[in-house]
């Protein structure tokens, strides 16, 4: 049996990053040949990767790279938080993110095809899978370009956000839009404005919301829970609130005030508030999924859109991306 020296094991570990016992086993199997040992470890990684192909790489970390007018978010996935917290795993994530940024990658396939240490990223991750015994893969890639960019990585590097914005020429715009990025991390909007919704999607979500509230009200009544009955909204998105709908609603409010005997001279003070309430009650889908329609996490007395306009009338979010693991 070939005697394996500590020096040979150390050299193989340095070249591959594999564990000491794995390196020793590989050298024994290859009769002490370094190239043969590396091939052994590579094949071992392929076998482990094949066995774990159907596993979910639902843990991991997110890295952000922002330079000039471009920003990139990339997440590297693994199976457990234990591996995700490993310094080598975090360093590899940051390395791949910077490579993807420099190579102007647009898709995960682009990233996997990049060359790293004499092999491709995809092959490197197969080798990493063999080393740690967990599926490892690039799970998300997003690129945002714009004149001004803000980024935010949430504690633990589980969530990353990029925001492209117009600053209104204010010096503290970076700080303000970092706050908007933090809001996006916490509140998970999927689109910027209600107009981005598909009409059919909005209709289905409206019907689902109405059914949900009706079911909750029926349960409340049946079980005598004593909770206040919820109003069932006619609509769910600002996209549905056409000028005709708003005009009809305003007229209905005035008729209601007239029936209540409220003097007409004070209607102008009451109608705007009631109309605003109607809009809030009938845009629940927007409040859940549209950034500009959500109540601002850093000041929930106003929407994100209102907070931005209060910061500066010409400031605006142009685009944003949010990625997360687990």
From Swiss-Prot:
The keyword Glycoprotein does not apply. It comes from the Bacteria. Keywords: Cytoplasm, Elongation factor, Protein biosynthesis. Gene3D superfamilies: 1.10.286.20, DNA helicase RuvA subunit, C-terminal domain, Elongation factor Ts, dimerisation domain. Pfam families: EF_TS (PF00889). It is found in: Cytoplasm. GO terms for biological process: translational elongation. The keyword S-adenosyl-L-methionine does not apply. Associates with the EF-Tu.GDP complex and induces the exchange of GDP to GTP. It remains bound to the aminoacyl-tRNA.EF-Tu.GTP complex up to the GTP hydrolysis stage on the ribosome. Belongs to the EF-Ts family. This is Elongation factor Ts.
């Amino acid at each position: 049996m070939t005697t394996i020296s500590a020096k040979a094991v150390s050299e193989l570990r340095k070249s591959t990053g594999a564990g000491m016992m794995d390196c020793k086993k590989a050298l024994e199997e290859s009769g002490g040949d370094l190239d043969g040992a590396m091939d052994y470890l590579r094949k071992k990684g392929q076998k482990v990767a094949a066995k774990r192909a159907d596993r979910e790489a639902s843990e991991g970390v997110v890295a952000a790279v922002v330079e000039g007018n471009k920003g990139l978010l990339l997440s590297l996935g693994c199976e457990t938080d234990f591996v995700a917290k490993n310094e080598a795993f975090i360093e590899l994530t940051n390395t791949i993110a910077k490579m993807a940024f420099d190579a102007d990658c647009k898709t995960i396939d682009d990233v996997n095809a990049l060359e790293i240490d004499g092999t491709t990223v995809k092959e490197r991750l197969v080798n990493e899978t063999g080393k740690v015994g967990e599926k490892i893969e690039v799970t998300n890639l997003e690129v945002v370009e714009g004149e001004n960019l803000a980024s935010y990585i949430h504690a633990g590097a589980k969530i990353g956000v990029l925001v492209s914005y117009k600053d209104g020429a204010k010096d503290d715009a970076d700080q303000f839009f970092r706050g908007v990025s933090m809001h996006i991390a916490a509140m998970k909007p999927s689109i910027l404005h209600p107009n981005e919704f598909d009409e059919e999607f909005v209709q289905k979500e409206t019907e689902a919301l109405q059914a949900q509230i009706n079911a909750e009200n029926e349960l409340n009544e049946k079980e005598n829970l004593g909770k206040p009955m919820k109003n069932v909204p006619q609509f769910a998105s600002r996209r549905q609130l056409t000028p005709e709908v708003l005009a009809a609603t305003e007229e209905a409010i005035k008729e209601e005030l007239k029936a209540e005997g409220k003097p007409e001279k004070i209607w102008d003070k009451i109608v705007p508030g009631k109309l605003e309430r109607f809009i809030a009650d009938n845009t629940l889908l927007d409040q859940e999924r549209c950034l500009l329609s959500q109540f601002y996490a850093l000041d929930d007395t106003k929407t994100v859109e209102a907070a931005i306009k209060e910061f500066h009338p010409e400031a605006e979010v142009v685009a944003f991306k949010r990625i997360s693991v687990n």
